[in-house]
């Protein structure tokens, strides 16, 4: 097997085995919280929908990249190609949009309690799911054109303005439609990334102010609530940083490719890997920075391993909860 194909297969395989269990774990745990506690915090609603969008990205793009890397060809027919490309476009845009919404929501939560900010806090928190639904409907309508331009790969000659997407082609036919599409993608990403960065800058500034003002009072109820909010803020900053890094690498390669008279197909594969990585890597950050998910994962691991240890070593273990954290005695 060609070393490059082997490396590509390993890379996309790792994204699949990390991304699917990670996103599924987030979705299942928050659904259980909703069923048991009858409510779900707005931030957790946003995280659930982000994990759902990430999962769709994996199923509509990363898995097919893996199958192509191991040598499987001609898997999709015409209608399946249209569905796959449409799903990928919408879900990837949803992933970016929801991450931007998450950073803006956290920024609003940390804003001063003025009349305007208090109104925004109330409305955004109460209507987080509605905002996501509106975003989804908007993106579905915006990307409906992909159904018309997407086709199963054929042996016939296509136009020079065709994107070759694994088993499918997206033929824009004219230079104008090709450049308009590329410009739209770039502007969309720039706007959302700018919102993420501005929100994160404000969050970082607020965190620094918080560190100076609340030292020594974390034991109070207000301090505990504030501490939870700022821990959530750090998680948002990490997610934004991850996306901005991947976005920067992807677009740096894209700008470089524009300067070349001939673009090696392998470079486009690397760009696909970078743009898809967020869907698989972001669940790791969400789980390790969310206390509820992190404690549940620890408890599940302890529950699975303790009986075996008890049998082998003749020891008795018990799991108890103290201060809302799982501990092993």
What are these regions (language model features)?
Residues 1-329:
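Transmembrane helical core of 7TM receptor-like proteins
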């Amino acid at each position: 097997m060609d070393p490059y194909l082997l490396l590509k297969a390993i890379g996309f395989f790792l994204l699949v085995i990390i991304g699917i269990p990670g996103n599924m774990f987030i979705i299942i745990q928050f659904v259980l919280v909703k069923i048991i506690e009858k409510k779900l915090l707005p931030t957790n609603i946003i995280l659930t929908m982000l994990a759902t969008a990430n999962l769709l990205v994996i199923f509509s793009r990363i898995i097919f990249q893996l199958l192509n890397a191991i040598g499987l060809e001609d898997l999709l027919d015409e209608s399946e190609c249209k569905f796959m490309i449409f799903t990928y476009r919408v879900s990837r845009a949803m992933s970016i949009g929801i991450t931007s919404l998450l950073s803006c929501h956290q920024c609003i939560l940390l804003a001063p309690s003025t009349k305007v900010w208090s109104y925004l806090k109330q409305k955004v928190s109460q209507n987080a799911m509605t905002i996501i639904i509106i975003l989804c409907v908007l993106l579905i309508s915006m990307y409906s054109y992909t159904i018309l331009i997407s086709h199963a790969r054929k042996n016939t000659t296509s136009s020079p303005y065709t994107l070759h997407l694994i088993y499918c082609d997206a033929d824009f036919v004219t230079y104008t439609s090709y450049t308009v599409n590329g410009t739209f993608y770039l502007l969309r990403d720039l706007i959302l990334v700018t919102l993420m960065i501005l929100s994160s800058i404000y969050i970082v500034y607020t965190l620094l102010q918080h560190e100076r003002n609340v030292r020594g009072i974390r034991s109070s109820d207000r301090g505990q609530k504030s501490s939870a909010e700022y821990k959530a803020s750090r998680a948002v900053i990490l997610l934004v940083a991850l996306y901005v890094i991947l976005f920067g690498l992807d677009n740096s390669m894209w700008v470089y490719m524009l300067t070349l008279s001939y673009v090696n197909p392998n470079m486009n594969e690397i760009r696909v890997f970078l743009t898809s990585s967020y869907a698989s890597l972001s669940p790791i950050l969400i789980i390790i920075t969310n206390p509820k998910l992190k404690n549940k994962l620890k408890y599940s691991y302890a529950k699975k391993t303790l009986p075996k240890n008890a049998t082998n070593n003749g020891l008795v273990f018990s799991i108890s909860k103290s201060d809302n954290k799982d501990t092993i005695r």
